[in-house]
Amino acid sequence: LEAFVFEPLADAIERDDFCSLAPIGWLHHKMQDSFFLVVGTHSCQGFLQTALGVMIFAKPRFATAVLDEDDLSGRDALEGLLPIVEAIVAEHKPGAIFLASTCTPEILKMNITGCAPPLEEKFGVRVYPCRLDGFDPSYTQGEDHVLEAMIARAPETSEKNLVILGCLSALEEAEVRLECETMDLPVPRFLPNESALDLPPIGPNTVLAAVHPYLFGSVAYAARERGCAIHKTIFPYGPDGSRAFYEGLAAAFGKTVSYEAREREAWGACEREVEAIRGRSVAFISDAMLELPIARTLRAAGATVPLVGTPNIYKKFHALELARLEGVDVIERPDRFAMYARLSEHKPDLVVANLNIANALEGMGFSVKWSTELSFQPIHGFNGAPSLFGLFAASLRRHDALAKIRGKTQTEAAPIDLDFFRFDGAPLSLRAPHALREAPQPSSPLPDPTGATSAALAPSPSHEVRH
């Protein structure tokens, strides 16, 4: 699909992001009749048990089929999954099972997708195969793969209808229904909803509106396979985004409406939170793929956004958001050391960062907000705007309180000078981004049992050293 061709503008190949199994947290709560069976390792099992915070005796609706040595030798995956799925069906009686392939099965080229049809036929339960591995740029794209698997099973239709794509809370869904009713639009269907079996019909006359900026895969799949029309506006984050979203929905059905008064009312309801944000600077170096729309609405609230680092940019899908970030340094797949230097230059009041580097940034003197907080909060639409701005207002108030305690009036970032040590004890200083300074050699080489000296074993200054 030409409209969704990816044009890389990468800062670095490496990336720092959360696990792609994280969307199970909100998806299994949304779809009450679902069960997520993850085919992976003990690391996957540990993540699900700790990150999602559910005790075993609570009978959670997710589990891990742990790979063992037999699986590594090429054993048929279906053979090992049969007794596990049988136990799940007997105990939980799910309406649908999501069979999730993780990093290890993908590397081993295990045919997890091919196991879905025979499992569905044998146990009479719908099985959605999906990929929840760490090869995607962002952990939130796990939801994208789940929705793509569901769209493939959705019934076809020739009628004009509206489908809202993306997991929303009950409050957020209620707002969309109310606004569509007010505009006299078709009753919207949601994917996902409370049942994993209740799939909205999708066809060439369907208007598909994605509410998350990371759903480009499922949107492209629906457009390619079903020929549906894609709702192209900015995403419904903040009063400005919500206004554009609803006015765009009306235009898709041939209606002209104005949400100017509704937007003004929403800004008034957020005034206390916006007051704490106005005039402050916020930078992003995170992994949620929510950075573009949230940076846009923070600018509309009066904040300064000097820097936005995001895991992935699809120029066509994100074009309208990028157009509203003119003058902002937007970096795709940012290199952490280069970003440290940029942050040191801009000295923002708040940095939205992923968990991997949050503590490091705190140690450098920055005030940090975890990017994962944005994924688990109801921040869409007019009603979600106070929650969205409240997240940033609370962090900035904390920043001000700590600054008073420390006797500082603004962020005083520590200089970027991280000392690493070679095996022979000679220090190497790494100055961002990727500037390697040669360290002095020790005056007397360390003895080596083989007769060689540590100086001879030390890497040449011309070699690239990566940390």
Provide a role label for each language-model segment:
Residues 1-467:
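An N-terminal assembly and electron-transfer interface module characteristic of large anaerobic redox
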